[in-house]
């Protein structure tokens, strides 16, 4: 997985590196990229090493911050973090608003073939918004975030990429317009890749009619037209990978009035179920590629080999076996999933990696 929040250090009541790795394994993952939105943020060599030291059954790859302490002002010591083991660079959920800073970052990482990961969002447009702007937000009377905030930054990021000829990965893509812009940029042979979450593929803004804060995410759930455009983009190869955007939130952060609830959803452990629920023409082989081969290719990680004598990196799963997602099976310290207490189809049976394995009964 290439975009997960494990909250450690600083917010260990929600998740730790250890529990986050357990959640990832239970979701069938052998590798997870950890975003830098911690306290202190992953802005130094020491912070990168702190995450790297947790490698066990699941390999944790730190994403170093682009700006010092994710403040969006000055560039962080990205090359030092790269040498210490940072897989890529991003300000995570705190998207880069300063175009000059992003321009410098793209130029800088190009010198060592680094990659910037960015969620496209103009926060001046989305501030105070609680959900997607559209018919549903009008009907239920919630302040909204216009999808143009994503589209503008997708366009900006692509143009900065064109100017620098660097590498960027856009994640959390949620609008039809953004997908169209990325598709066009790829045709022009720009080095842009992108990922989408399982919940943006599965759910639309209609889920918020009940004011269920578990569906409050950022980028927000969009229109049914956007959702279908995302599925089409997976089918035609415009979308390169699936990213979990796993965001643990404590009970107190979610069980409040919708306006005050924090954004985010647990999603690592339920990836398989959510993809199997999707009505699409996408084969299970294609999903596996979007979750494993493609991210490894983009971020220059070795592809595991299934042959005699090779180290096994394997996930064994059933597409039909049911399991109940509850306090007993949940590996996270948080419970903020709309699927909690439900019986789900599609079960991870065993994960093998780093000469270790875990079997799920």
Which residues fall in each region the model found?
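C-terminal cap of metal-dependent C-N hydrolases
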Residues: 260, 311-361
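His/Asp/Glu-enriched, well-ordered alpha-helical/loop segment
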Residues: 139-167, 235-236, 240-242, 247-317
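Divalent metal-coordination and catalytic microenvironments
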Residues: 3, 24, 28, 60, ...
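Alpha-helix-loop-beta-strand connector modules within alpha/beta enzyme cores
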Residues: 45-63, 107-121, 270-274
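Short, acidic/polar
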Residues: 13-21, 70-81, 156-157
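Metal-associated gating/positioning segment near the N- to mid-region
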Residues: 1-55
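Histidine/acidic residue-rich metal-binding segments in metalloenzymes
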Residues: 76-242
């Amino acid at each position: 997985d290439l975009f997960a929040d494990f909250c450690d250090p600083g917010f260990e009541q929600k998740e730790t590196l250890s529990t986050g790795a357990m959640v990832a394994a239970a979701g069938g993952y052998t590798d997870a990229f950890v975003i830098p939105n911690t306290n202190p943020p992953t802005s130094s060599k020491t912070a990168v090493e702190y995450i790297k030291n947790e490698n066990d059954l699941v390999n944790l790859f730190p994403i170093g911050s682009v700006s010092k302490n994710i403040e969006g002002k000055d560039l962080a010591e990205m090359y030092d973090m790269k040498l210490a083991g940072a897989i890529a660079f991003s300000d995570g959920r705190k998207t880069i608003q300063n175009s000059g800073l992003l321009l410098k970052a793209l130029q800088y990482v190009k010198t060592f073939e680094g990659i910037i990961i960015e969620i496209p969002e103009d926060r001046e447009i989305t501030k105070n918004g609680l959900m997607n702007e559209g018919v549903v937000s009008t009907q239920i009377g919630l302040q909204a975030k216009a999808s143009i905030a994503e589209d503008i930054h997708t366009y900006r990021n692509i143009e900065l990429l064109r100017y620098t000829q660097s590498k960027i990965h856009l994640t959390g893509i949620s609008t039809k317009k953004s997908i169209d812009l990325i598709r066009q940029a790829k045709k022009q042979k720009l080095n842009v890749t992108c990922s989408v979450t399982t919940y943006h593929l599965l759910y639309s803004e209609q889920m918020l009619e009940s004011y269920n804060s578990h569906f409050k995410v950022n980028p927000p759930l969009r229109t049914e037209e956007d959702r279908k455009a995302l599925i089409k983009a997976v089918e035609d190869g415009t979308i390169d990978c699936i990213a979990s955007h796993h965001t643990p939130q404590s009970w107190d952060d979610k069980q409040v009035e919708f306006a005050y609830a924090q954004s985010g959803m647990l999603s690592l452990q339920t990836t398989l179920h959510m993809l199997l629920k999707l009505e699409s023409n996408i084969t299970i082989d294609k999903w596996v590629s979007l979750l494993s081969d493609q991210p490894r290719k983009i971020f220059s990680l070795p592809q595991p080999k299934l042959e005699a004598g090779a180290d096994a990196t394997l996930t064994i799963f059933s597409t039909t076996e049911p399991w109940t997602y509850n306090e007993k099976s949940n590996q996270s310290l948080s419970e903020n999933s709309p699927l909690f207490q439900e019986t789900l189809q599609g079960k991870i049976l065993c994960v093998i990696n780093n000469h270790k394995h875990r079997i799920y009964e």
